């Protein structure tokens, strides 16, 4: 489907526990893309002591969300650091319509665009089971409580699910069954991307 595109830019999203981080890494390796995880970008800016990292830390130390403008500025710098390349896979961003519009504008200003948006679809009962199992070894407290897991899934539905219609209108949205062995899901993704 997208093999003829010289630079492939993908957004991958899905509910917590859907396997998006694992699949993003596998797809990155398969297509030689740059994996951009907003969490990693934040940690890098903070540990490097950049101005953006310092600003983000000020918000985070007060328990406040970092404004989208700061996040977009970090992403812009990250993208500039790697262009030219084969493309990017964005993992964990965008999460809201406003972020999606900001990302589109940022990429448009750099003569780039999102080519495809892939959502890994998994039923909530399967996700809860996966996350509780992961919580046994991850050490993440939000993976160890069914109440916290349900809150995260509800948060996703409220904030991130509206992105489906946003990207459907752009004819970029594809839904992939995220249930099964990792390699089965990867095969479905590669079939869609090829």
Language model features with spans:
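Glycine-rich phosphate-binding loop of ATP-dependent small-molecule kinases
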Residues: 1-194
């Amino acid at each position: 489907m997208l093999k003829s595109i010289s630079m492939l830019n993908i957004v991958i999203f899905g509910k917590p526990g859907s396997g998006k981080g694992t699949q993003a890494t596998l797809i990155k390796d398969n297509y030689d893309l740059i994996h951009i995880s907003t969490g990693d970008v934040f940690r890098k800016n903070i540990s490097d002591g950049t101005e953006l990292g310092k600003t983000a830390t000020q918000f985070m130390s007060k328990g406040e969300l970092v404004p989208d403008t700061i996040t977009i500025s970090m992403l812009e710098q990250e993208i500039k650091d790697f262009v030219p390349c084969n493309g990017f896979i964005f993992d964990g961003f965008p999460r809201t319509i406003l972020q999606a519009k900001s990302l589109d504008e940022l990429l448009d200003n750099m003569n780039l665009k999102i080519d495809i948006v892939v959502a890994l679809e998994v039923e909530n009962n399967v996700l809860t089971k996966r996350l509780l199992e992961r919580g046994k070894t991850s050490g993440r407290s939000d993976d160890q409580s069914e109440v916290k897991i349900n809150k995260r899934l509800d948060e996703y539905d409220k904030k991130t699910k509206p992105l489906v219609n946003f990207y459907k209108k752009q004819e970029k949205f594809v839904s992939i069954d995220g249930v099964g062995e990792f390699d089965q899901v990867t095969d479905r993704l590669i079939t869609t991307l090829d």
